[in-house]
């Protein structure tokens, strides 16, 4: 979803499929550090599956963390250079979903193959997955708009031109991942949804 004030600012709130799949797969095999969860953002699915005896769990966790970080850096770079056509990255456009051969972290491939259809079933549920997160796109965008109007009233001028890209993931990020002035990752829960003071501090830097 996009909210904008013509010739001034733009806020793009997206439920990115790829980021949410990476988190889903990480939860499914217990590859995400416990520090990424709290009472507002719990690990789900909770039915953790066993990994192959040929793989080391610590190595898989490192690979998962690096993969997640790689995708965030890629998205942040594209936001910086205005490549907004890739707001929502679909898994099947990045990878061959039958093999995930494009994934550099080879040991993760079999877990991606196994978890992808399970993820997509949940992701496309009428009352869950993507639809639940898209509801928060609307809520977050509306409240952010209100914050910008409040700041404009205080400083008695219109906002400077800026673009803010917000990715929404369903869990795994207990605090905001503030990559840059123009790119952040949040969950529907926790202190950012909706922490007005945090948003006011963030937006004052942009407005």
Stretch-by-stretch model annotation:
Residues 52, 56, 135-143, 190-191:
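Conserved aromatic-histidine-acidic binding/catalytic patches
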Residues 62, 106, 142-145, 149, ...:
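Generic alpha-helical secondary structure signal
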Residues 186-187, 191-207:
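Active-site recognition of the HExxH zinc-binding catalytic motif
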Residues 25, 30-36, 40, 76-80, ...:
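Generic alpha-helix signal with a bias toward terminal, lower-confidence helices
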Residues 1-125:
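N-terminal low-structure segments adjacent to metalloprotease catalytic domains
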Residues 119-184:
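Auxiliary, metal-adjacent structural segments of Zn-dependent hydrolase domains
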């Amino acid at each position: 979803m996009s909210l904008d004030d013509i010739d001034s600012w733009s806020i793009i709130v997206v439920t990115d499929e790829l980021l949410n799949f990476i988190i889903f797969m990480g939860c499914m095999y217990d590859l995400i550090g416990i520090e990424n969860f709290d009472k507002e953002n719990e690990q789900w699915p909770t039915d953790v599956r066993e990994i192959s005896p040929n793989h080391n769990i610590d190595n898989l966790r490192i690979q998962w963390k690096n993969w997640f970080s790689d995708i965030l850096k890629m998205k942040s770079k594209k936001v910086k250079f205005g490549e907004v056509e890739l707001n929502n990255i679909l898994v099947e456009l990045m990878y061959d979903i039958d093999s995930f051969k494009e994934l550099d972290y080879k040991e993760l491939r079999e877990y991606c193959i196994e978890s992808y259809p399970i993820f997509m079933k949940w992701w496309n549920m009428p009352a869950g997955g993507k639809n639940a997160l898209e509801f928060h796109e609307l809520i977050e965008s509306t409240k952010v708009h209100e914050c910008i109007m409040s700041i404009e009233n205080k400083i008695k001028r219109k906002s400077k031109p800026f673009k803010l890209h917000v990715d929404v993931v369903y869990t795994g990020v207990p605090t905001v991942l503030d990559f840059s002035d123009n790119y952040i990752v949040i969950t529907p829960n926790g202190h950012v949804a909706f922490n007005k003071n945090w948003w006011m501090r963030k937006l004052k830097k942009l407005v």
